[in-house]
Amino acid sequence: MCVSRLALLLGLLLCVGAQLSFAQHWSHGWYPGGKRELDSFGTSEISEEIKLCEAGECSYLRPQRRSILRNILLDALARELQKRK
């Protein structure tokens, strides 16, 4: 009997604690999953230098990445972003 009351009390405490906690915070303009409302960006001006870098013709040298793992992760992220466009 004591074990069942303890289990019930712990379950109730868990439910109340989950409702009262602020486990997830969404910043203004962001939605769950990291999505952002596209209309909030408006028409942004992109400089010519950025356009050239996207085409692969950067006017400046990029610093070399030190870590191979970081390089692989950044390249994979860049490919995923290109797929979504």
From Swiss-Prot:
Coiled-coil ranges per UniProt: none
Entry's localization field: Secreted
Tissue-wise expression: Expressed in only one cell group in the mesencephalon.
Transmembrane region(s): none
Annotated GO MF terms: gonadotropin hormone-releasing hormone activity; gonadotropin-releasing hormone receptor binding
Entries under InterPro entries matching the protein: GnRH (IPR002012), Gonadoliberin (IPR019792)
A Pfam cross-reference name: GnRH
Family: Belongs to the GnRH family.
Function comment: Stimulates the secretion of gonadotropins.
Name the record gives this protein: Progonadoliberin-2
Species the sequence originates in: Haplochromis burtoni
